[in-house]
């Protein structure tokens, strides 16, 4: 990803973390592995945070572009 990805990197990483977390959580439930369930929940939280950062970067970029075009 480039310096000018405007939050795309974080959004992609966030989605990957959320999917990875969901898989870990489900496998943890099926195997009755509480540690794996907890790791899955934590990965989903990290993914949501990264996704939010990506959205904020995207909105900041859109705002700056809007201000420059006035």
UniProtKB/Swiss-Prot annotation:
Reading the lineage from the top rank, the first entry is Bacteria
Q: Which SUPFAM superfamilies match?
A: Hypothetical protein YjbJ
**UniProt xrefs under InterPro entries:** CsbD (IPR008462), UPF0337_stress_rsp (IPR050423), YjbJ_sf (IPR036629)
Q: Its family?
A: Belongs to the UPF0337 (CsbD) family.
What's the protein name?
Answer: UPF0337 protein BT9727_3385
What is the organism of origin for this protein?
A: Bacillus thuringiensis subsp. konkukian (strain 97-27)
> Could you read off the lineage of the organism from its UniProt record?
Bacteria, Bacillati, Bacillota, Bacilli, Bacillales
């Amino acid at each position: 990803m480039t310096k000018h990805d405007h939050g795309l990197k974080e959004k992609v990483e966030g989605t990957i973390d959320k999917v990875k977390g969901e898989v870990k959580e489900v496998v943890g439930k099926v195997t009755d592995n509480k540690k794996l369930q907890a790791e899955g929940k934590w990965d989903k939280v990290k993914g949501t945070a990264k996704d939010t950062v990506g959205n904020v970067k995207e909105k900041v970029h859109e705002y700056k572009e809007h201000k420059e075009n006035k």
